[in-house]
Amino acid sequence: MQYDMSRTTLFEVSWEVCNKVGGIYAVVSSKALEAAALFGDNYYLLGPDLGNNAEFEETDEACWQELRAITARRNLACRFGRWDIPGRPKVILVGYRDRFNQGQLLFSLWNRYGIDSISGGWDYVEPVMFSTACGEVIEAACQTLAVPASGPVLAHFHEWMCGGGLLY
């Protein structure tokens, strides 16, 4: 049976979208051309808004209009554009630093899932905050873009660093 990927929406979340740190950057950037071809306009990469993300070009394309409005209404700090790599995939850079009360977020993970992370350092807390904010953005996108009406939605969270988004 042949599956029509053009009806599926894929959100791919990585700390290394427009942010070269290690090996996942190579994985995500090297498959973006093929993913963009398979999923078309339904392929979105989400990365951290670090203020000076390399290879990111902020755009004012019509495809961002509705999502820009709903993320603003929900006080989700996002920048929308393209990653300047082959395929020029759509990218949402997600602000997270001022989004959460660190203690409350970590308590909710402990309370809901038994994840004991109150003593976690910033190298743990920062990715949890980022990926949780990405979960909120994906939820907003699904509601705004009427994605569920067109086909299935997939969210791929790379590495442990993005696990908080799975739990959102």
Give the predicted meaning of each segment.
Residues 2-4:
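N-proximal low-complexity "stem/linker" segments adjacent to membrane-targeting elements
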Residues 6, 45-150:
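A conserved catalytic-core segment of Leloir-type glycosyltransferases
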Residues 157-161:
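Short His-centered aromatic/hydrophobic patch
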